[in-house]
Design a protein with these regions (language model features):
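Polytopic transmembrane helical bundles with strong interfacial aromatic enrichment
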Residues: 2-147
Length: 147
């Protein structure tokens, strides 16, 4: 039986270009940063009323693209360059994009079409996106340092 302290991760394959590992780590870090920006802006528009609340809602909507774009590019890099070296990370990168699109879409259903029933779904996806983004970001940094 191995404990957490005894367990070691599988080595990173050396045939993965350092540039791919670095780009993936940077992009997942940027996506994670925008997840936190999303949380900040959501707390601001929930607290604000009137024009100020609408402004924060607009900012919240636009910063979603700051999450989606780097997450999508990171998933493409993972599929192209990291899938054999880090298969779990690759799959979770794709799941992050899918969850982010679900969060983005539900946000638009709420803000554009005023379908407030989607709020619980949107909040659930935000938790999934946060957990995935942080985990992927930490793991990508570890892979980059080991490689």
């Amino acid at each position: 039986m191995t404990t957490t302290a005894e367990r070691t991760d599988a080595p990173v394959r050396t045939d993965v270009r350092p540039g791919a590992r670095r780009a993936f780590a940077i992009l997942t870090g940027i996506a994670t940063l925008f997840v936190f920006v999303q949380f900040f802006t959501s707390s601001e528009f929930i607290r604000s009323e009137g024009p100020s609340g609408e402004t924060w809602t607009d900012i919240h909507g636009w910063t979603a693209y700051g999450l989606l774009a780097p997450a999508l590019v990171a998933a493409v890099i993972a599929l192209a360059a990291l899938r054999r070296a880090a298969p779990v990370l690759t799959v979770l990168s794709v799941v992050l994009v899918v969850a982010s699109v679900g969060q983005w879409g539900s946000g638009h259903l709420i803000s554009t079409y005023h379908l407030d029933g989607w709020t619980a779904f949107h909040v659930f996806f935000s938790s999934v996106v946060l957990a995935l983004a942080v985990w992927i970001s930490v793991r990508s940094a570890l892979i980059r340092r080991r490689g």
